[in-house]
């Protein structure tokens, strides 16, 4: 036929049977990719340390989505929380992956069947015997079925009535588990961090979808609207479908990047804004002050800080630090986290506590500056030692660790103090294993960053596709140079007298 690459899909334009076939094949490929990717990730995933080596540090992409829907156990005998799996059953990680592979095979077979048996009576208008699809009715059917699915997910899966529930955690990502969630029908349901809103919105949207589907099945569109929106043209379906997809892609890009109940930090990693706002740092400080007010020593107060919480307060887990063109998991950058060294407290000779100014998100290097409680600079690591006034040596800075592996240890050696001051710029200080994965020391983005980047790119492409195909279908007659409706529509008794041929325009 000699079609250019961007017009090859015209071969299924007026062929409903093979249009179904190519969509079945596409769904087969998507399902097959999901199952295959899950098996690959399970093959390389290390479940041994859910605190310092969680799935998002290992670059897992499909496992977090399975986990947030309630899958937590593996046929390999492990669970996502680090415990031993007792009886994983069918709905384990491997079971879901296998189900996708089986579904892919069935869809593949269905695609071949529809490609071979493409000329079904179902696709022909009984009055004219021409290939024809009742697109408004098909729209109603799809809307009704998707509404049932949406309602079922919110009313049964999320609530735990018939299903496991979804992943629910606290704001600091410490206590996450799969739980049944009751729908929130008041104003709190609009809080993006309230999991009850997920259930309520799916129930409400499902009911709306069912009602809208029934409406479109029962009510025919007006002729002017049918013609104006080109409802008889399959390219109209393509254009509006692309609009739905690009809108969804933009929405999930936002919920992933800014955070929401649907994208818990235990599964996808923290957001960049939690570093920018000192979210975890403030919570750690609050807990420490509470412990100190109870009469505990500094070592005891810091020892009670969960290692998981301290690890979130580290800039290497900020998805905006990774860059868009550095391939690999976070562990391929700074390495596999082995342990928390403890909280570093810096003091000058007089005993006043100093605080290292933390590196902002979009800096690769940042001057090492230590300030007092009033924000006044008291010490630094100077660029030119000959002009320095506040160097570590001159001020006599020492560092003491509380909690962690170096609990109670003090260093006075300037070289060692400088080393830990540089590392304190990056938040809490951790020991990393860079040998196992030959990590290069350059930060990588978490799956949160990759997901956002990919979906923004696809949303922009699909937005252009919506405009392109929408314009093609609405202005089809203009582009083709042919008026699709050559005969004027006549409503006798209103615009035209019966038998008056002088004012009516007719095609030749």
UniProtKB/Swiss-Prot annotation:
GO terms for cellular component: chloroplast thylakoid membrane; photosystem II. It is found in: Plastid, Chloroplast thylakoid membrane. Pfam families: PSII. Signal peptide: none annotated. Keywords: Chlorophyll, Chloroplast, Chromophore, Membrane, Photosynthesis, Photosystem II, Plastid, Thylakoid, Transmembrane, Transmembrane helix. Binds multiple chlorophylls. PSII binds additional chlorophylls, carotenoids and specific lipids. The chain crosses the membrane at residues 21-36, 101-115, 140-156, 203-218, 237-252, 457-472. It comes from the Eukaryota. PSII is composed of 1 copy each of membrane proteins PsbA, PsbB, PsbC, PsbD, PsbE, PsbF, PsbH, PsbI, PsbJ, PsbK, PsbL, PsbM, PsbT, PsbX, PsbY, PsbZ, Psb30/Ycf12, at least 3 peripheral proteins of the oxygen-evolving complex and a large number of cofactors. It forms dimeric complexes. This is Photosystem II CP47 reaction center protein. It comes from Chlorella vulgaris.
